[in-house]
């Protein structure tokens, strides 16, 4: 399992098709956005420079750092065409933050013939759990879900 992974800045192998050029928002950044309560649109992300995007990937995820990130994103996006990124309530108590294995993730694993136990779930890093929850949610195309299961359940 990957419980020792740095959840703040780790990018998954299944994200390799856009790492480097950062044409999509990687899951490590999406997790930080949820934690600091910012709705950053893809248009906002794409308007940022490569260096700014990399800085968001590398940004730490401690409490103080997340508050600084929230303000930084307000400042960066204020002059953008889509306007300032919207504030949301910071996520607390989300399924990926819980010890219980979410039914949607369990069902997605079962459908794909993947064995995922509660013990495995509790040993995953918060970022791993975040990725599985995001990729397994209804309405998502599930394009990278099998690769995500393979990567995080090693």
Spans of model-derived segments:
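Glycine-rich, aromatic-bearing surface loops/beta-hairpins
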Residues: 133-154
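A structural feature that tracks compact, well-ordered secondary-structure segments
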Residues: 41-48, 56-59, 117-137
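The feature marks the first
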Residues: 2-53
């Amino acid at each position: 399992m990957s419980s020792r992974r740095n959840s703040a800045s780790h990018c998954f192998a299944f994200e390799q098709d856009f790492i480097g050029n950062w044409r999509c928002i990687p899951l490590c950044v999406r997790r930080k956005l949820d934690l600091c309560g910012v709705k950053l649109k893809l248009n906002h992300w794409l308007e940022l420079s490569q260096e700014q995007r990399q800085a968001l990937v590398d940004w730490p995820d401690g409490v103080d750092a997340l508050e600084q990130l929230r303000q930084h994103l307000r400042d960066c996006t204020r002059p953008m065409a889509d306007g300032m990124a919207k504030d949301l309530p910071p996520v607390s108590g989300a399924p990926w933050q819980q010890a219980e294995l979410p039914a949607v993730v369990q069902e997605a694993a079962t459908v794909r013939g993947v064995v995922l136990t509660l013990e495995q779930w509790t040993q995953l890093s918060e970022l791993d759990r975040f990725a599985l929850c995001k990729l397994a949610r209804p309405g998502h195309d599930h394009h990278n879900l099998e690769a995500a299961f393979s990567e995080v359940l090693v």
